[in-house]
């Protein structure tokens, strides 16, 4: 029987906050999403047998761009399956990504793809520029971003899209979402990991209109009750997770 670790978004908690680390809501001055990601300055952190290590050896694809053509921002679309259509430049879907650390973790055999997140729910991965996705009636915030084959997000400007759409013809309750404010979206880990994929598990999240620093916004990651303060917007490897649900 294969050993497996179950890693669900509800049990790994992330909170974005300003310099006062006792508060969990977003505070402080909003900043543009980082265009480049520098080499890690944070050291590995370890608590209660869980080790969290930033890494930055993945290919950057700085010229990769994504544009969501459909549905238009603010549009109202029919109930049911919503059609998405993207234009991509300098990024090849289904290609396998290089990167030493990333390829030590769970990898999609289908290659590079698009992550589509609705209302901060678990993402769906898509390997073509056109697809449909069932979305409930109402108003929704949709984040899309480019992803390497091992599910690490591209974090530069132009590699993501954030917009509000309306599904269905019935009157909707406005979300009053301020897309110019600072936002954080959870991405990885997701679902069930087995075999060698349990040894190192990626933690990745997406920031919009902000970045992280020791003096500014930080992310509090709570893993099995242990808190880690993250001051760099980078992917992290998690090691030492016990088998079972985390």
Language model: regions and residue ranges:
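Short, well-structured beta-strand segments within conserved domains
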Residues: 82, 86, 136-148, 205, ...
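Short, compositionally biased P/S/T/A/G/V-rich stretches that sit at domain boundaries
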Residues: 34-79, 167-195
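Short coil/turn motif common to extracellular beta-sandwich-like domains
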Residues: 77-83, 97-100, 195-204
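Short beta-strand segments within Ig-like beta-sandwich modules, predominantly Fibronectin type-III
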Residues: 121-128, 226-232
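Short acidic/polar inter-strand loop motif in beta-rich domains
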Residues: 147-155, 228
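Short beta-strand elements bearing conserved aromatic residues within extracellular beta-rich modules
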Residues: 114-116, 219-221
